[in-house]
């Protein structure tokens, strides 16, 4: 029996992607309001508890922050077991992290079939983007949701959890009644840049998918 005020609804979400894409920063931004400027390879797994208040009551996400380093690959099945949803993250300033997205997706769906998955391109506050909206096709081919995000500016930070909450609860009218407490942005996301990215994504969504069998 949950204590009074404790969320009755909770979900396990696994956060995966290459090392250095900002997964741990993503979580710590929510929970402690700290942005990690120094990259420290995550050892093992940390479970972060994140509560969102919605018009359907509080929802708790138990976020498993998995190691992005391949040397920990043997442990990943254990991370994935009983996951109810997932976030795959890549770094828009690093093409290789996007090229590795299909591998993360394959590992994930091998253990967890038919769970809602969000693909996130992090670090969009950096103007020198290497991965643009038009070539980001993987989510369309695999029917995943996609968001540009930025830890440093808080841009779109709650969007992945908002989309997952609606999917998991099965209510398209679910709304957050309070935003999570985040630290003040370290940088300001240029509104014109954000508008351009959103426009580019909209255009990309209406572009026909290429015929080739390339995963990306």
Swiss-Prot record:
It comes from Mus musculus. There is a cross-link at residue 71 (Glycyl lysine isopeptide (Lys-Gly) (interchain with G-Cter in ubiquitin)). This is GTP-binding nuclear protein Ran, testis-specific isoform. There is a cross-link at residue 71 (Glycyl lysine isopeptide (Lys-Gly) (interchain with G-Cter in SUMO2)). GTP binds at residues 17-24, 65-69, 122-125. It comes from the Eukaryota. GO terms for molecular function: GTP binding; GTPase activity. The modification N6-acetyllysine is found at residues 60, 71, 99, 134, 159.
